Amino acid sequence: YNLFGQLSEILTKEINGKTLLADFSLSNQNGFDTKEYYTDETIIYNNKSHNPQVVTDKYSMNTVYIWGYNNMYPIAVIKGATMSQVSSILNEIDKLESMPFPTLATEELYRRLSYIQGALVTTYKFNPYIGITNCIKPNGESVTYEYDSFSRLTSISNNTGVLNKYYYNYKK
């Protein structure tokens, strides 16, 4: 855990098949040798917002998160890229994350980040305190979410048409 109590690393220990789970207890009384453990994930947090910034899985695949709306919602998730690759394309990441509303349109953000060779980019647009309004997936598909005046999801659609519609019927 880091200084803010957030999970920073996940370790796995392989044990022989004869040990019952009920008999297994993790003790750090005398310290433990981390060489016996395998790192499943490493999480690096943003120093200012304390949001996850880079998650590295056990195969060393990075996922970079860019936050927006005053660091409340993720506006981009980039799999297969490093933070330095993302920073070289978006030199205003800190500014983007601290703005109440992103200064880059979702489409422009997606277009810029798609230049990272081999990366899978997903971008998001939100209506704060209501929900997601748009998502552009790695394959370029744009999905739109619509809400009613009570902030309830009413429809999900993409380039081909309406995927789902939601109706809220009340008994009188």
Features from the language model and the residues they span:
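Beta-strand elements of repeat-based all-beta scaffolds
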Residues: 1-57, 61-137, 142-172
